A protein has these predicted regions:
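Oxidoreductase cofactor-interface core, primarily capturing Rossmann-like NAD(P)-dependent enzymes
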Residues: 1-41, 52-55, 59-66, 73-76, ...
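Cofactor-binding loops of NAD(P)H-dependent oxidoreductases
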Residues: 49
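A hydrophobic C-terminal alpha-helical subdomain
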Residues: 224-284
Length: 284
């Protein structure tokens, strides 16, 4: 069996895809710029490659028919890198953006959305079998957004606390990816992936508190206050995108889909289950 190549395997979803493929006994090859930063199963093969330098991708692509792609490079690298990859493979599963999710949270124009659309168009024109994954809000964002405040014992200060989302566990995204990478029947399919519940951001923080066994103090920030507090830690385009999306989605429940169950036959994991599995990230 030829290995499956994972491009972008150092991130939250890529690591889970690598782990779940290895658990199934599927050989994997992980392409990354910095091999020293990788820590995977010994079953994995590691190859150095940089999407911004397409000529470095050839060694990783040797003997590869199937690729899982998480784009982790500047937009300027899209065309030359994808041309190099797509001319050598037969199947690609791309972790895209929720471009077609019928909800205001995902309909705000932004750079990430435009980049995802560009990549999809190039893949579609290549003639390869493709599958696009469109996850909504990632449950692991909670660690980035609220982890430090919760660990420190401070109040969780956050904007748009009553805006609902349907956070999805990274294990469920990976489970869908693994099916699409290893089974037939997923060519030219687009899967919208969400968690099983519409939960306000306030409710998500309260669930984390419940898992930790303590009541968390929560304070609402205005959009202006949030911008000032978030900009030191997050890029301006990300902050702008999030604030605009939360504002647009503040008056209606989150979109909850059935993509995970449809592909895997199992229900998506709840946010409570995710928080329980990641409780250590919120403890001192």
């Amino acid at each position: 069996m030829n290995p499956i190549l994972i491009i972008g395997g150092t991130g939250t979803v890529g690591r889970q895809v690598a782990y779940q493929l290895s658990e199934r006994g599927v050989p994997i090859r992980v392409l990354a710029r910095n091999l020293e930063a990788l820590s995977f199963s010994r079953q994995a093969e590691f190859v150095r490659g940089d999407l911004t330098q397409p000529e470095t991708l050839d060694a990783g692509l040797d003997g590869i028919e199937t690729v899982f792609l998480v784009w982790v490079a500047p937009p300027v690298a899209v065309v030359p890198a994808l041309e190099r990859v797509l001319r050598k493979i037969r199947r690609i599963v791309f972790l895209s953006a929720p471009l077609k999710t019928p909800h205001p949270l995902f309909q705000q124009p932004n750079a990430a959305r435009n980049l995802g659309l560009q990549i999809e168009q190039i893949i579609e024109a290549s003639g390869c079998d493709w599958t696009f994954l469109r996850p909504g809000m990632f449950a692991p964002n909670a660690k980035e957004w609220w982890g430090e405040q919760i660990r420190s014992g401070k109040a969780v200060r956050w904007p748009y606390l009553d805006t609902p989302t349907a956070p999805i566990d990274e294990r469920d995204i990976a489970a869908v990816a693994v099916r699409a990478l290893t089974e037939n029947g997923h060519a030219r399919m687009e899967y919208v992936l969400t968690g099983p519940q519409s939960l306000t951001q306030r409710e998500q923080i309260e669930i984390i508190g419940k898992v930790l066994g303590r009541s968390l103090q929560i304070e609402e920030l205005s959009p202006e206050e949030a911008r000032r507090e978030l900009l030191p830690d997050f890029p301006r385009p990300v902050v702008d995108m999030l604030l605009e999306a939360w504002a647009a989605a503040s008056c209606q429940p989150a979109f909850v889909g059935t993509g995970v169950r449809h592909v895997t036959g199992q229900p998506a994991r709840s946010f409570f289950e995710w928080a329980t599995n990641n409780a250590a990230a919120f403890r001192t």
